[in-house]
Amino acid sequence: MVASDEFRRVFGSFDQDGDGKISATELRLCVKASLGEDMPDEEVQALMALADTDGDGLLDEEEFVRLVTEMEADGDEEEDDDDETCRCLREAFAMYEMEGRGCITPLSLKLMLSKLGTHLDVAECQAMICRFDMNGDGVLTFDEFKTMMMA
C-alpha cells in the first residue's frame, strides 16, 4: 500500500521518536494534540490491536495508512446514516408542514395530529411548539423540528 504525501506527513508527526513506528503512547499523545481530547487507554489499545497486523505492538506506515483509511470509510458510513436520518426527518417534517410556509405552525400541527388520532386545540399545539421554538417565532423550522425529534 502506497501512502500519500499527506498520510506520510501525518505519520511523521505521530512518529515522535523517528523510529518509523508509532507506539500506543505516541498515538494517544498525537490524538490529544490533534483533537484536543484524551483518548482512553482501552481505545488506544483497541486501535493498535486492530491495525497492528504484524503483531509487534507498533504501527508502521502501512498499518497506519490502513487504519486511517478504514476510519475514514467508517466515517463515510456514519455520514450515510446521517443522510438517511435527515431524509426521514425531512419526510416527516413535510407531513406536518401543510401550509406551504416551510415551517410547522400550531394549525398544521393540530391538523396532522388529528389525522393521527390525537385531538388537541391550537393553544395546546402552540405549547408543544414553544418547547422547541428556539427563535421564538411561534413555528418550528426544520432545524427546530430535527432538534425536537433527536431529543
Curated annotation (Swiss-Prot):
Stretches that traverse the bilayer: none
Chain ranges of the EF-hand domain: 2-37, 39-74, 84-119, 120-151
Gene3D superfamilies named in the record: EF-hand
UniProt KW Amino-acid biosynthesis keyword: no
Residues the record lists as binding Ca(2+) 2: D52, D54, D56, E63
Function statement: Potential calcium sensor.
The protein, known as: Putative calcium-binding protein CML23
Organism: Oryza sativa subsp. japonica
Lineage: Eukaryota, Viridiplantae, Streptophyta, Embryophyta, Tracheophyta
Primary gene name: CML23
